[in-house]
From Swiss-Prot:
Name of the protein this chain belongs to: Polyhedral envelope-associated phosphoprotein
Residue span of region Disordered: 104-151
Similarity comment: family membership: Belongs to the baculoviridae PE family.
Biased composition (Basic residues): 104-150
């Protein structure tokens, strides 16, 4: 993965990556990506204004290596591996190469503007200076590769240190997520056990209610013939009384 224009470095040489570039290479829904982006601590996320070739400035979010790891490790893929390894290393190497080249240009400009005599001068006073200057140039040329290697080694050491911190933070995040998952799993197991106990209690209550209903229906069924006979007797007595009253009224 080659360095792109989707990165920037601050004054402390911290690498910041454009979140749009990360989103375009991840297979993640936009809403989930935005929610995950705003869970990153503010010190690992910054907002900048980007003209983008339009007449109105737009807001762009940048994340450092920690924030990029939080975004890409949710969906592991080849892009995540390259982003957290070769992409960061190549951008740091190009960054330090540009810094070294700009420093060499500034040194060459300062030398060209210096008021000392040039080597082409034939004055005898300038010859010793030219010799000392040539010696200093040869020394600077011999020391510049060493200085460049040292800067590269320092950059790689800084990248290694940041990667170690990144892996430690990611491992801590994974540990916290694992603990939260275990807590949620234990809570779900407790709720499931409570549901099982509740269903068992409901089954027992249903059986008791059905048994009592069956007993009550049997008692009602058994008592119905006695009530029928009693009603028949009462009806006969009522008819006899009515007939007696009618006969009494007729004779009178």
């Amino acid at each position: 993965m080659k360095p792109t224009n989707n990165v920037m470095f601050d004054d402390a040489s911290v690498l910041w990556i454009d979140t749009d570039y990360i989103y375009q290479n991840l297979k993640m829904p936009l809403q989930a990506f935005q929610q995950l982006l705003f869970t990153i601590p503010s010190k690992h996320r910054k907002m900048i204004n980007d003209a983008g070739g339009s007449c109105h400035n737009t807001v762009k979010y940048m994340v450092d290596i920690y924030g990029a790891a939080v975004l890409v490790l949710r969906t592991p893929c080849s892009f995540a591996d390259q982003l957290l390894s070769t992409f960061i290393a190549n951008n740091y190497l190009c960054y330090f190469y540009r810094r070294r080249r700009s420093r060499s240009r500034s040194r060459s400009r300062s030398r060209s503007r210096s008021p000392h005599c040039r080597p082409r001068s034939r004055s005898p006073h300038c010859r010793p200076r030219s010799r000392s200057r040539s010696r200093s140039r040869s020394r600077s040329r011999s020391s510049s590769p060493r200085r460049g290697r040292r800067q590269i080694f320092d950059a790689l050491e800084k990248i290694r240190h940041q990667n170690d911190m990144l892996m430690s933070n990611v491992n801590q995040i994974n540990l916290n997520q694992t603990n939260q998952f275990l807590e949620l799993s234990n809570m779900m197991t407790g709720v499931r056990n409570q549901n099982v106990q509740l269903l068992a209690a409901l089954e027992t209550a249903k059986d008791v209610i059905l048994t009592r209903l069956n007993t009550l229906l049997a008692e009602i069924t058994d008592s119905l013939p006695d009530l029928t006979s009693m009603l028949d007797k009462l009806a006969e007595q009522l008819l006899d009384a009515i007939n007696t009253v009618q006969q009494t009224c007729a004779t009178s």
